[in-house]
Amino acid sequence: MSQARIIDGKAFAARLREQVAAEVAVLKAEHGLTPGLAVVLVGEDPASQVYVRNKGEQTLAAGMHSETHRLPANASQAELLSLVDRLNDDPAIHGVLVQFPVPDHLSQAAIVAAISPDKDVDGLTVVNAGRLASGLPALTSCTPAGCMVLLRDVVGDLTGKRAVVIGRSNLMGKPMAQLLLAADCTVTIAHSRSRDLPAICREADILVAAVGRAEMVRGDWIKPGATVIDVGISRFPSRDPVAAAAGKTRLVGDVAFDEAKEVAGAITPVPGGVGPMTIAMLLANTVSAAKRLNGIAE
């Protein structure tokens, strides 16, 4: 059997960002509206700083208004919620995102609950989760929404496909399953405690791995010809001893890529697969939120 098609998330994301920029230009020209995204960063987690910087740069590149609000690691819950309230009320801001993780003394659940559902571009509030589950228009979590863009291009019509999602988080696993269900897939949600997980995975025409365990999904778990979407991301020392000694690292997904590509029909690499789609979908969600908040048809 020939090797799997490698799904180029960077190329898809670049096209999506171009589409978003074109939509933004139309909103500015026809409605005098500039979509605005505010990102809140608490503390100085290095990975979060990189993510936040990338979000800001890509927001500006799409012609949108970008704000980054930085709070110290010892900021109180009240300070953070006060900032979120101000952003909820700011008519120039259409998307509000708090970069997680936050320091341990802060309640992630309370933070999510404070974000206006109309500006919840991460799709985490119970209102958006409920709307998604009910088949109503919703702001959908960016990573699963990006996965669906990839799947629709690679697979085409998803009707009747057997889909297995490994992972049940509110940010990824649950909304991914809802989106697949809405596309008329037959969906199984599995997780690290599922019995005989390899056998469950072998039934899948579409396998989405989002469990957070490096290379847990082996090649012999995959149905020949299946489409594999690897959402996991773990960091390990470089295989090159010199590079490792210098602190260089490599990124690894939840799927044993070298094994899986010999069996799957198509597969996303890590890095360069799902990751680039996440920020592109964040921009798309912000444009959607701006349109809805201003009564503009999508």
Swiss-Prot record:
**Quaternary state and partners of this protein?**
Homodimer.
What is this protein's name? Bifunctional protein FolD
Q: Which UniProt keywords apply?
A: Amino-acid biosynthesis, Histidine biosynthesis, Hydrolase, Methionine biosynthesis, Multifunctional enzyme, NADP, One-carbon metabolism, Oxidoreductase, Purine biosynthesis
PANTHER family (UniProt xref): C-1-TETRAHYDROFOLATE SYNTHASE, CYTOPLASMIC, C-1-TETRAHYDROFOLATE SYNTHASE, CYTOPLASMIC-RELATED
Native organism is Caulobacter sp. (strain K31)
**What is the protein's known function?**
Catalyzes the oxidation of 5,10-methylenetetrahydrofolate to 5,10-methenyltetrahydrofolate and then the hydrolysis of 5,10-methenyltetrahydrofolate to 10-formyltetrahydrofolate.
Alphabetically, the GO molecular function entries are:
methenyltetrahydrofolate cyclohydrolase activity; methylenetetrahydrofolate dehydrogenase (NADP+) activity
State which Enzyme Commission number(s) the record gives.
1.5.1.5, 3.5.4.9
Q: Which InterPro entries match?
A: Aminoacid_DH-like_N_sf, NAD(P)-bd_dom_sf, THF_DH/CycHdrlase, THF_DH/CycHdrlase_cat_dom, THF_DH/CycHdrlase_CS, THF_DH/CycHdrlase_NAD-bd_dom
Could you name the domain of life of the organism this protein comes from?
Bacteria
Q: Which family does it belong to?
A: Belongs to the tetrahydrofolate dehydrogenase/cyclohydrolase family.
Q: Write down a Pfam family by its short name.
A: THF_DHG_CYH_C
Signal peptide residue numbers: none
Tell me the route in metabolism or biology where this protein functions.
One-carbon metabolism; tetrahydrofolate interconversion
Gene3D superfamilies under this entry? Leucine Dehydrogenase, chain A, domain 1, NAD(P)-binding Rossmann-like Domain
What residues bind NADP(+), as annotated? Answer: G167, R168, S169, S192, I233
